Regions:
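Feature captures the catalytic ectodomains and active-site-proximal regions of enzymes
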Residues: 1-334
Length: 334
């Protein structure tokens, strides 16, 4: 197998390091060739180990790349903008478009998405890596990237079908919580389809083996594709994206360094500090957002929360390459 390690030269650039990192992720680590030729568990294990080594390099010698990643979250395209929800006046309607959010979809699944598009007669007009909202949690994505100024605090994806600001703009939101949902999509309307997969699999407390969840999701996707992408009416452009990625902690995909950063966050991957609480001092393993009184754990440090959450091999909520960087794929039917 060719060497997957990120070249240190990519992190020594005087300019932005992030373009080289994202190119390495999609062309070397999570490449279509590796996905097509390797057993699923080997693809997962070797890829995550390579990303873990890269994140350690960034953490100990190129921390400016973390700040670049934080800045990139403010420049990424959003489902809200793609669906025309920022148009004025509030009743203005954009041409019909569709956004399909696969909850928890990561860059490791991008080759699978591209392969399915080719197999089912879709043209890939754009495939890129974007930085999702911070923190890397579902409710924050809904608030920041979907509803924006229309958001009420704490709206979850299952509530999107009843959000008046979407229906007023001619957007039909559908929450898909099964592999084979029975849905009726209205022709002429923009669509926001939210699938609970792969999140439904990856947050399973009982799934302890790296060979179990990722291959299982790969098997499920063909069915999900039929009830999401292929269900969109012809002629409607479709964006596939995700609210957050998942970091994998199986095998060697975990930092062995000792760090006090996780303790400062109460063994959580992200924490908001009350106004009266002491805010963490700068630390190489913390991404700090003082204006929001928030701090997030950088890279591959594994938290040790109490309870069953500590056993999860797949986690999100923190500030790592695999949690923050997600796919953005634009499809049209051939």
């Amino acid at each position: 197998m060719p060497d997957l390690d990120l070249s240190p030269d990519a992190l020594l650039s005087s300019g932005s390091r992030l373009p080289a990192v994202t190119e390495w992720l999609t062309r070397a680590v999570w490449s279509q060739d590796r996905f097509a030729t390797l057993p699923r568990e080997d693809y997962l294990r070797s890829g995550e180990a390579a990303v873990a080594r890269a994140e350690e390099l960034i953490s100990v010698g190129a921390s400016r790349a973390w700040d670049e990643l934080a800045a990139e979250t403010t420049r990424a395209p959003t489902p809200r903008a793609f669906l025309g929800l920022d148009r004025e006046p509030a009743t203005a309607r954009a041409p019909a478009r569709a956004v399909v959010v696969f909850d928890g979809l990561s860059l490791r699944e991008l080759p699978l998405i591209l392969a399915l598009a080719a197999q089912t007669g879709f043209r890939v007009d754009e495939s890129r890596v974007i930085a999702t909202s911070l923190p890397t949690e579902t409710l924050d994505f809904v608030s920041q990237r979907v509803l924006g100024p229309d958001a009420a605090r704490g709206i979850g994806p299952n509530q999107l079908p009843s959000v008046g600001a979407l229906t007023a703009r001619g957007v039909q939101a559908v929450y898909l919580d099964s592999l084979t949902p029975r849905i009726s999509l209205t022709a002429g309307k923009s669509l926001l389809l939210w699938s609970t997969y792969p999140d439904r699999l990856f947050k399973n407390d009982q799934a302890r083996f790296d060979t179990q969840l990722f291959p299982q999701f790969c098997e499920y996707v063909a069915t999900l594709w039929k009830y999401t992408i292929q269900a969109v009416p012809p002629g409607v452009p479709i964006v596939i994206t995700s609210d957050h990625g998942y970091i994998f902690f199986g095998g060697t995909a975990e930092s062995a360094r000792e760090s006090a950063a996780a303790d400062q966050l109460g063994q959580q991957r992200s924490c908001v500090f009350e106004d009266a609480a002491p805010y963490p001092a700068p630390h190489p393993d913390l991404q700090r957002f003082p204006a929001q009184h928030r701090a997030m754990l950088r890279g591959r440090l594994k938290t040790r929360p109490k309870g069953t959450a500590s056993r999860r091999l797949y986690q999100h909520g923190g500030f790592s390459l695999m949690e923050v960087l997600v796919p953005w794929v634009l499809l049209n039917r051939n």
